[in-house]
């Protein structure tokens, strides 16, 4: 994928951002996906991302972090990490839980608990810059193809406990193969949350996947969440445990409270998201409501 016509320009820009970051105190940042914002601004002036890359809104990365109950002790993987949005959000939340950036635990989180893979060379550069901006040494970021054996072996060698991902949707990039490889190579019992197009992993197309792993929940997301016009859902799996007769909890988050602002994308201008997020987390951590269902 060519983010801009001249790759030297984007490399120079990233270098400038990193240089500026050395003069900025990012200790109190909350895991903002700085380079993801940069990428999306460029893509607003392009017809369509050639690689199917659609970066995840910040409020959804935070929601998914809570949805699978990630904590400071977890080892988090994003095997299609894009600009690193899930990883910087996880890093910020985990460091906050251990008492801040200056703790010994915070240093361990940055060096040993965040793992990312990105196939696209230019996007990988964004992820590295993003982690550097947030004072992380990009220790566990790799430029690999999650569809291939080398990436599978790399994943298998890591002590992953949670997975947060929004893989590229284009058919030629093998979204289903990516999901299968992740589920097959993380430890048994790993909780995984994937954002996928609604029809990408319908139950009748999963086949052997559910013979090995459990699909716990499907949360349909608002239809206008992504500018690309793709309708998506969050699929939550637990690895290494066959589905058998277990039911799948399904629900529809019709509204996230954000509104489109001209030339600025979608924003929570009425501060509705916090209450909406609390409602859905409460619903998903308790019994199903009458308005929602089990598949």
Model-predicted segments: where are they?
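A conserved structural/catalytic subdomain of Rossmann-like adenosyl-cofactor enzymes
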Residues: 143, 155-157, 162-287, 291
């Amino acid at each position: 994928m060519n983010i801009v016509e001249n790759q030297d320009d984007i490399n120079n820009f990233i270098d400038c951002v990193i240089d500026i970051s050395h003069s900025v105190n990012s200790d109190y940042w909350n895991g903002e996906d700085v380079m993801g914002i940069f990428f999306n601004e460029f893509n607003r002036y392009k017809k369509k991302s050639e690689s199917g890359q659609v970066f995840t809104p910040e409020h959804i990365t935070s929601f998914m972090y809570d949805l699978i109950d990630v904590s400071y002790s977890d080892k988090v993987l994003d095997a299609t990490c894009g600009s690193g949005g899930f990883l910087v959000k996880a890093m910020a939340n985990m460091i906050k839980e251990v008492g801040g950036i200056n703790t010994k635990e915070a240093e361990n989180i940055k060096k040993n608990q965040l793992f990312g893979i990105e196939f696209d060379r230019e996007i990988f550069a964004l992820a590295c810059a993003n982690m550097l901006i947030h004072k992380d040494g990009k220790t566990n970021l790799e430029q690999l193809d999650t569809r291939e054996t080398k990436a599978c072996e790399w994943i298998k060698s890591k002590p992953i406990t949670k997975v947060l991902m929004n893989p590229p949707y284009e058919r030629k990039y093998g979204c289903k193969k990516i999901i299968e490889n992740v589920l097959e190579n993380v430890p048994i019992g790993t909780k995984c949350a994937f954002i996928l197009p609604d029809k990408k992993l319908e139950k009748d197309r999963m086949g052997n996947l559910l013979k090995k792993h459990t699909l716990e929940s499907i949360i349909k997301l608002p239809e206008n969440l992504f500018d690309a016009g793709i309708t998506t859902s969050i699929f939550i799996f637990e690895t290494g445990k066959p589905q058998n007769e277990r039911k799948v909890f399904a629900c529809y988050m019709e509204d996230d409270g954000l509104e489109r602002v001209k030339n600025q994308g979608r924003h929570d201008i009425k501060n509705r998201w916090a209450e909406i997020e609390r409602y859905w987390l409460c619903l998903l951590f308790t019994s199903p409501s009458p308005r929602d269902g089990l598949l």
